[in-house]
């Protein structure tokens, strides 16, 4: 075998391992950039990126997604979704399982959810729309350090609700909008224990059996609770 043939043979035999080593680059699940993407033993989609957005069309067995800088979009996810970005928005079209989403700088939108939701934003608004008639436990925790929060639930959704709205400006312009019969109270004194003086508007109450725990917390933002 001459040198040219030997070189060609070496390239052909090493090609499969070279392609395997490129997994995560140009993945159909991502928008490019350096990433590590894989499918878990149970079929879940797992993507971790050092920078750039993530776009997953369908994750029927769950998804664990994270990026150090970029937005994350999921079309449809079942079972569970664990999503985190250090700088960008999170958008989920439809989730039938549990959702745990966190962003350090952006909004969170879940267009339709049929399970428990935990959504935390360090600097953006949150919008969640719970649908369906499932009797499973569907606790909801929504928290923003600076933005509006809007939660929509089915009209007969049983819940134990606690809402805390803090504002730091003397000319109060924020409010809790709800028609669920919650008790609403506003503090009279400025609380300086958190550094920046703030006042609180709180709302609480039980709707139906109170089966599902709903907690909503925001700073300098409105809270809207819809029942439909």
Describe each PLM feature range.
Residues 1-228:
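Intrinsically disordered, low-complexity terminal regions
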């Amino acid at each position: 075998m001459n040198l040219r043939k030997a070189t060609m043979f070496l390239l052909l035999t090493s090609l499969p391992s070279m392609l395997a080593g490129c997994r995560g680059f140009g993945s159909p699940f991502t928008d490019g950039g350096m990433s590590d993407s894989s499918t878990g033993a149970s079929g879940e989609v797992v993507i971790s990126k050092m920078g750039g957005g993530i776009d997953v069309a369908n994750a029927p067995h769950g998804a664990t997604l994270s990026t150090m800088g970029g937005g994350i979009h999921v079309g449809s996810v079942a079972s569970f979704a664990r999503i985190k970005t250090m700088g960008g928005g999170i958008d989920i079209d439809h989730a039938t399982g549990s959702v745990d989403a966190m962003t350090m700088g952006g909004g969170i939108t879940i267009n339709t959810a049929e399970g428990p939701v935990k959504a935390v934003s360090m600097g953006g608004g949150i919008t969640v729309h719970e649908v369906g008639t499932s009797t499973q436990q569907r606790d909801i925790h929504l928290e923003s350090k600076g933005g509006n929060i809007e939660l929509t639930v089915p009209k007969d959704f049983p819940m134990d609700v606690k809402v805390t709205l803090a504002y730091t400006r003397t000319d109060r312009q924020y409010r809790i909008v709800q028609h669920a019969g919650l008790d609403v109270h506003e503090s009279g004194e400025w609380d300086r224990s958190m550094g920046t003086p703030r006042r609180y508007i709180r709302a609480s109450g039980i709707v139906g059996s109170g089966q599902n725990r709903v907690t909503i917390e925001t700073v300098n933002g409105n809270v809207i609770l819809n029942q439909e």
